[in-house]
Amino acid sequence: MYAVFQSGGKQHRVSEGQTIRLEKLDIATGEAVEFDQILMIANGEDIKIGVPYVDGGKIKAEVVAHGRGEKIKIVKFRRRKHHRKQQGHRQWFTDVKITGISA
């Protein structure tokens, strides 16, 4: 059984027991979270597609950890002008473990 849900403006395909990295959620580590924006649920040959969301579909998960991603560098450069601007960014994330999928 797997499902496709929406969180943080992105779509994720998950199955039970899977750990997935999402955009930062304001929920403490170890607490349960429930996603209700389910786009599709598939259980073998039985497939439910939402318009836009599946009625009564829920994904239960547990927050495993919070952290920051790898640093990326942003460089702005103007040729021949002795102008260079450099900036770094590290995006916050939340790791969640999927504990249950229900239709």
Curated annotation (Swiss-Prot):
Transmembrane segments: none annotated. The keyword Transcription regulation does not apply. GO terms for molecular function: rRNA binding; structural constituent of ribosome. One of its GO terms (cellular component) is ribonucleoprotein complex. The keyword Phosphoprotein does not apply. One of its GO terms (biological process) is translation. Keywords: Ribonucleoprotein, Ribosomal protein, RNA-binding, rRNA-binding. It comes from the Bacteria. InterPro entries: bL21-like, bL21-like_sf, Ribosomal_bL21, Ribosomal_bL21_CS. Part of the 50S ribosomal subunit. Contacts protein L20. NCBIfam families: L21 (TIGR00061). Belongs to the bacterial ribosomal protein bL21 family. HAMAP family: Ribosomal_bL21. This is Large ribosomal subunit protein bL21. It comes from Serratia proteamaculans (strain 568). The gene is rplU.
